[in-house]
Amino acid sequence: MATREKQKALARKVARELEVGTASLKKLKTSARKARVVANLVRGQLLSDAYVNLAFQKRAASEPLRALLKSAAANATERGFDADNLIIEEIQVHKGEIARRFMPRAQGRATPIRKQSTHIDVRLSTRDSK
């Protein structure tokens, strides 16, 4: 392995050791725009407050996001961090694949339907580290 690549690999390893808890959700069947509205509500909040806020949201993306936060919290507690001090440091919502379908219309025509998906990444930190 070249020296520069070795340094990059070592830097990634050190960064992984310093992480508190991460989780990612791939191919959520909703558009990124709709999921970002819910993600913006909980960004930067304490984890327990985020659970409460998501429990009372009527949007469809709130339940998968709540499960994702639960997974990230479980990853953090597995690494030995206290779940009461966890904060949502970063939450990113990316566009996923778009499945293209067609709906038949009048006079032999067809109109396209775009079924969008979303990828969500969450990184937690402790309240003390901020």
Predicted regions and their residues:
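Structured, basic alpha/beta domains of bacterial-type, RNA-associated proteins
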Residues: 2-30, 36-41, 45-130
